[in-house]
From Swiss-Prot:
Signal peptide: none
Function according to Swiss-Prot or TrEMBL: N-acetyl-galactosamine and D-galactose specific lectin. Binds the Tn-antigen structure GalNAc-alpha-1-O-Ser, the T-antigen structure Gal-beta1-3-GalNAc and IgA.
Subunit description: Tetramer of four alpha chains associated with two or four beta chains.
Keywords, comma-separated and alphabetical: IgA-binding protein, Lectin
Protein name: Agglutinin beta-1 chain isoform 1
Single GO MF descriptor: carbohydrate binding
Family label: Belongs to the jacalin lectin family.
Length: 14
């Protein structure tokens, strides 16, 4: 998971 600006973005790479 990447966390930026106090918000969490979940990225799935296939």
């Amino acid at each position: 998971n990447q966390q930026s600006g106090x918000s969490e973005t979940k990225v799935v790479v296939g």
